[in-house]
């Protein structure tokens, strides 16, 4: 189905819908993974020094308790309790950081210093997500897309991540986009929600209006059942 959508400066977006609704396909379109058969995809990444989607849009897909489907999941699976000595330290994986001001800001926000000399396989689920966010944000993207950031977390770690993301949303140069399956996962810092269902991308709505509309709809469905 055709999609007309804009993400404006100052907005933090949640793309919400059930599994299989088409959320991942929408993200693929937004990031330019697939060429459009029709229409135009336009970016404005100012004040970034580069205008490429590769440099300015970073995507993290969380799959399970151990973080994600990409590099960090690989780290956790590659080393186990029998070969901990070969596992890298957080410090080594973060590498050299050229932007000292950004490093200090992110290390303070995510409390990275106490983790630097820990081995990657010994991080808790919450620590691993903070590590991955820090590593990604050290590249200074304009847009950070997180797919299922709360999956596999206990209540305390979920609350911690909520608080960290809320602080992250206050960074003037960063727009956050969350891809979520559950209505109740939409954090308070989210300004707008894009509902996706059965391959159809709905109209972007303000968060309060979305929650009101979809809770009423779900209540009607329950009564009908």
Predicted regions and their residues:
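Conserved beta-strand-loop-alpha-helix hinge in the C-terminal portion
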Residues: 196-223
């Amino acid at each position: 189905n055709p999609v007309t959508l804009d993400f404006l400066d100052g907005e933090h977006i949640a793309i919400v819908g059930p599994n299989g609704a088409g959320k991942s396909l929408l993200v693929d379109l937004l990031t330019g993974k697939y060429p459009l058969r029709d229409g135009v995809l336009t970016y404005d990444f100012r004040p970034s020094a580069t205008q490429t989607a590769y440099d300015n849009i970073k995507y993290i897909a969380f799959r399970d308790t151990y973080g994600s489907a990409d590099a960090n999941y690989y780290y956790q699976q590659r080393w186990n309790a029998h070969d901990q000595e070969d596992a890298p330290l957080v410090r080594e994986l973060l590498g050299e950081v050229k932007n000292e001001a950004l490093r200090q800001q992110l290390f303070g926000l995510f409390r990275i210093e106490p983790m630097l000399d820990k081995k990657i396989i010994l991080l808790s689920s919450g620590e691993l997500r903070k590590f991955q966010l820090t590593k990604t944000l050290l590249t200074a993207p304009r847009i950070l897309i997180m797919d299922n950031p709360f999956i596999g977390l206990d209540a305390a770690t979920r609350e911690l991540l909520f608080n960290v993301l809320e602080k992250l949303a206050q960074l003037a140069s960063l727009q956050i986009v969350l891809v979520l399956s559950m209505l109740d996962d939409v954090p308070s810092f989210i300004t707008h929600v894009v509902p996706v269902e059965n391959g159809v991308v709905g109209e972007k709505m303000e968060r309060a209006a979305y929650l009101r509309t979809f809770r009423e709809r779900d209540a009607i469905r329950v009564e009908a059942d």
